[in-house]
Amino acid sequence: MQSSSHLNGPTTAADTSASKWTVGDVMALMETWYPAATAQSWDRVGLIVGDPASPVRSILLALDPTAAIAQQAVAGPSGDGQPYDMVITHHPLLLRGASFLPVTDPKGGVVTTLIRSDIALFNAHTNADVACDGVATALADVLGLRDTVPLEPCGTDAERH
């Protein structure tokens, strides 16, 4: 499952292709929706690869950070070789950590591909699962479920999200 998004940010009519967004801006927005503090203790969420100061004009959304996704990110939104600026995945690339990331390793290949093309990689996993209007809510909505409650209340809002 994947989709793409183009961020135009606040632009003028004369400047429609320039982005006013940065990787850091996207990270801050994701933090408001899916706070890292709400992730499970074993989870690894946040910026994996990239520079928070880099501009963002397009984002590739995907479930997993695989080699195929990295190659699609390099190919870009129109496949013309103008890469996406950022990839946001649900599942983390380095859940258990890594001591070495050679290009011959699947995860090392993903990291190398993204770094060579200056593409940021960010993920939101269990923090997106538990968020109000997050992954679980979206799935419940698609399935038509009503009167849902969290399995493990974790928040302080009225619905304990």
Task: Kindly label every feature range from the protein language model.
Residues 1-161:
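Hydrophobic structural segments
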